[in-house]
């Protein structure tokens, strides 16, 4: 075990202080945070890797760590790609992301308004805690064209005696950029300790997260200066922000314009069981050597052929306060154990008290020290001739209290009939906000929360969640309900309704550059309503669904990157179809999305989106090796995508760059031997189809030319 302890120390200290040139495939992230949506679900085969984990907000829902197969996203290690609908970035790996398909973002109280790096970050509620008998490690590494285009991810967990478990979740993205003055380095580190009392009446979770981004900006390609000569290599293509030579946190970029964003949080959460059945464990029974805390009195998700994130679960549960829809596969070895004899026990009512205290320290800084070359780029935002600077910092002390009750039997199992759970809570957030040059502000958020789970039969589940804000954000609220009906051989039907009212973010209301006020607004609150329905037929690889979004008082950034509020109602209907075909070893997976924005000039969206994977998968070399050879194609229809203003980290409207049908084509080969997986792939094959054109997804920010990327993943128990 000594090498694994060394690995933990290396990841912990290197992730925070090291210069790092590493990158890898991110491990399964939590389903309790984020703003991804109804297409984040993927059809995969069940697996047999006997490791399960859970998240602190939902400790009774065990999820199988079942991704040792060659899934359809293993060869796509970038966080913006992989499962579900892909997001678009600035061409460079690790850069700010925006949606291609509209999804509402969960809002709860005060929001600073900086979300361009959310897809790379790990919130404390998304740290997985593992139920294991042996130490567990999952390490993955991928590299692109150079040693400064790398990704590293590490999942590690081990037990310290029968009551304590430790978990580490680490992701590092490092890319020096292929065009001039580019750089991107993102780090997400989460570590946690779980203590379980032998009586089962107390569980405590200590977590620490460190998320950071360092970005060098070139403003995009100067298309007016591109010639046949200077476009032969990415490094000679002219860019809008030439800047001056400077070291960039060990990455070595030439960027004078840079962004630094750091979020750190330390938290302690604990559950008290006040009334209810204790764990049914013989006192004299010796636990297996190396065994850690037993799993909490768990709800075993019902069998299904889908794993990962549910299609309607994500947007409902981004707050981490409600339980996920139980559609995860339980594929561990316990499925082979004969079921125990049924014992009639009296039903009992369990009462749980939850408390969490956390402290977060977040700061964001942009600076450009070379305005002599960049003055034309910033226009009205260049308020000072010596340089530009934007700095904002928030420190948040948060306390969460919840009390809940659930009906259980005497053995600690959730009741299989007429089972239900009711929970009410209170959240207080004390926020200290620093923004140059105004004095420090103190804000208070107080939220009343509640959620109710009702399952009259094992085939029907209803989940509801609500919160209401008091004090500074008084009047903000969120209501949501999720219904799931398991129709057996006829499939699964899901429906969702959501409504929320929320105040503008801080950046939308007020912004300073180099201590000069650029804008100050008094926007009305935004009102959103979402209705969704999905029908799945897993045995045929079919899923059909739709969503309807209604947005009032929508806030956007106009063509000069100024915040504005729409006086008209925006409607966004969406229909999607996912259909997977297979014939022997030949597979074809398809996703189609149709969406329509009633105000394309305010909320531009591509009307059509498609994602296709054609591949051959089977065992070779006397069935010892599993191999997958395939091609991935992603495309969207013609539209005006939002541009990016790195000065304050927001995407904004533009009217000059319209991008039509330009598919992104990748060819990949993946192999697996036992628990070791590897891949090699070629990216941007369409460069050969259009050798004289740049590939843009975000205006002026081109994707790299043709390149080869390889990766390796190894997971083991020891």
Residue ranges of each PLM-predicted region?
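A generic short-segment signal for beta-strand/edge and adjacent turn/coil regions
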Residues: 103-111, 121-125, 133-138, 158-162, ...
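Flexible coil/linker segments and helix-coil junctions enriched in charged and small residues
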Residues: 310-311, 318-320
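Membrane-proximal, glycine/serine-rich, low-complexity loop/turn segments characteristic
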Residues: 25-265, 272-301, 305, 311-312, ...
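Bacterial Sec-dependent N-terminal signal peptides
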Residues: 1-29, 681, 705-706, 711-718
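Generic low-polarity alpha-helical segments
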Residues: 1-2, 7, 21, 25, ...
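Exposed, low-structure sequence patches enriched in small/polar residues
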Residues: 250-301, 305, 311, 327, ...
């Amino acid at each position: 075990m000594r090498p694994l302890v060394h690995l933990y120390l290396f990841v912990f200290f290197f992730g925070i202080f090291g210069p790092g040139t590493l990158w890898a495939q991110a491990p399964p992230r939590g389903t309790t945070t984020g703003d991804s949506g109804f297409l984040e679900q993927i059809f995969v085969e069940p697996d047999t890797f006997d490791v399960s984990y859970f998240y602190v907000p939902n400790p009774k829902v065990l999820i199988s760590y079942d991704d040792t197969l060659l899934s359809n996203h293993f060869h796509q290690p970038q966080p913006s790609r992989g499962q579900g609908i892909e997001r678009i970035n600035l061409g460079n790996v690790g850069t700010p992301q925006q949606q291609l398909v509209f999804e509402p973002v969960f809002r709860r109280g005060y929001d600073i308004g900086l979300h361009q790096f959310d897809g790379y970050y790990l919130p404390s509620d998304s740290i997985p805690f593992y139920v294991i008998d042996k130490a567990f490690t999952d390490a993955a590494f991928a590299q692109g064209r150079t040693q400064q285009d790398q990704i590293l991810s590490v999942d590690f967990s081990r037990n310290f005696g029968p009551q304590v478990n430790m978990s580490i979740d680490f992701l590092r993205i490092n890319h020096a950029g292929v065009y001039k003055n580019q750089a991107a380095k993102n780090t997400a580190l989460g570590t946690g300790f779980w203590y379980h009392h032998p009586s089962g009446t107390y569980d405590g979770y200590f977590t620490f997260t460190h998320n950071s981004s360092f970005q060098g900006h070139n403003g995009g390609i100067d298309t007016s200066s591109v010639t046949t000569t200077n476009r032969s290599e990415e490094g000679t293509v002219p860019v809008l922000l030439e800047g001056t030579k400077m070291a960039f946190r060990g990455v070595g970029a030439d960027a004078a314009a840079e962004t630094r964003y750091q979020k750190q949080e330390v938290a302690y959460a604990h559950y008290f069981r006040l009334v209810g059945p204790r764990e049914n464990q013989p006192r004299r029974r010796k636990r297996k050597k190396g065994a850690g805390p037993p799993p909490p009195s768990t709800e075993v998700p019902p069998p299904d052929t889908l794993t990962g994130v549910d299609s309607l679960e994500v947007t409902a549960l981004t707050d981490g306060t409600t339980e996920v829809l139980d559609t995860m596969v339980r594929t561990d070895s316990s499925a082979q154990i004969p079921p125990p004899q049924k014992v009639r026990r009296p039903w009992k009512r369990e009462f749980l008290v939850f408390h969490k205290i956390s402290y977060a320290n977040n700061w964001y800084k942009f600076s450009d020290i070379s305005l002599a070359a960049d003055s034309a780029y910033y226009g009205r935002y260049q308020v000072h001739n010596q340089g530009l600077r934007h700095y904002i910092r928030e420190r948040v002390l948060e306390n969460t209290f919840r009390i809940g009750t659930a009906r259980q039997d005497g053995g600690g199992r959730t009741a299989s009939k007429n089972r239900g759970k009711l929970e009410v809570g209170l959240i207080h957030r004390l926020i200290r906000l620093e923004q140059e040059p105004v004095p420090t502000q103190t804000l208070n958020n107080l939220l009343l929360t509640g959620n109710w789970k009702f399952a009259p039969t094992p085939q029907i589940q209803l989940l509801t969640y609500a919160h209401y804000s008091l004090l500074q954000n008084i009047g903000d609220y969120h209501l949501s309900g999720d219904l799931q009906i398991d129709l057996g051989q006829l499939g699964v039907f899901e429906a969702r309704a959501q409504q929320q009212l929320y105040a503008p973010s801080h950046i939308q209301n007020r912004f300073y550059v180099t201590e000069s006020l650029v804008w100050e607004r008094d926007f009305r609150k935004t009102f959103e309503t979402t209705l969704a329905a999905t029908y799945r037929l897993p045995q045929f690889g079919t899923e059909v669904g739709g969503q309807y979004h209604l947005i009032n008082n929508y806030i956007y950034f106009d063509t000069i990157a100024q915040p504005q509020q729409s006086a008209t109602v925006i409607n966004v209907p969406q229909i999607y179809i996912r259909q997977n075909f297979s014939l022997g070893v030949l597979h074809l997976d398809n996703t189609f999305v149709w969406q329509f924005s009633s105000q394309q000039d305010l909320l531009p969206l591509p009307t059509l989106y498609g994602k296709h994977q054609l591949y051959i998968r089977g065992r070779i070399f006397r069935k010892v090796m599993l191999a997958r050879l395939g091609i991935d194609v992603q495309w969207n229809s013609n539209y005006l995508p939002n541009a990016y203003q790195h000065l304050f980290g927001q995407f904004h409207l533009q009217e000059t760059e319209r991008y039509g049908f330009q598919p992104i084509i990748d060819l990949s080969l993946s192999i697996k031997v036992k628990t070791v997986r590897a891949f090699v792939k070629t990216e941007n094959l369409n460069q050969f189809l259009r050798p004289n054109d740049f590939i843009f997804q975000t205006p002026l920010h081109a994707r790299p030319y043709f390149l080869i990327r390889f990766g390796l993943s190894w997971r083991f128990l020891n």
